[in-house]
């Protein structure tokens, strides 16, 4: 049984192409989820958001396309394609789509 699901194995793929932005929505695709790690691909339509919450583990965001605004413990960070942001465990954080954007979220 594979640990990573919902994506082809042993193929070179464009990661951003594995999910589509849908108007007025936040779309997600989970690649891995267990007690130790989660890996989820997100596509945000401009203006959409995930409200403030916290996480049991450190969260690493890798922005694939577009620009997202992340608020971590009250500090705002504007991240564009190619940027990485670490959101430490237990710190409140939120995400806002400054424009259509895609990101990979890994929580450990």
Language model region names:
Residues 89-108:
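Ligand-binding loop in jelly-roll beta-barrel domains
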Residues 1-36, 71:
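A short, N-terminal "cap"/entry segment at the start of jelly-roll beta-barrel domains
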Residues 64-65, 80-81, 99:
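A cytosolic small-molecule/anion-sensing beta-strand core signal
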Residues 41, 60, 75-77:
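Short, surface-exposed secondary-structure edge patches
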Residues 57-69:
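Glycine- and acidic-residue-biased ligand/ion/polar-headgroup-sensing regions
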Residues 24-25, 38-55, 89:
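Conserved short histidine dyad/triad with adjacent acidic residue
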Residues 74-89:
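Short acidic-glycine-tyrosine-enriched beta hairpin
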């Amino acid at each position: 049984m594979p640990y990573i699901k919902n994506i082809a194995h042993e193929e070179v793929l464009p990661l951003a192409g594995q999910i589509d932005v849908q108007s007025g929505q936040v779309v997600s695709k989970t690649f891995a989820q267990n007690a130790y790690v989660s890996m989820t691909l997100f596509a945000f339509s401009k203006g959409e958001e995930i409200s403030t919450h916290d996480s049991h583990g450190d969260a690493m965001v890798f922005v694939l396309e577009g620009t997202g605004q992340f608020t971590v413990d009250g500090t705002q960070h504007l991240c564009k394609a190619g940027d990485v942001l670490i959101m430490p465990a237990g710190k409140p954080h939120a995400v806002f789509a400054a424009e259509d954007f895609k990101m990979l979220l890994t929580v450990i």
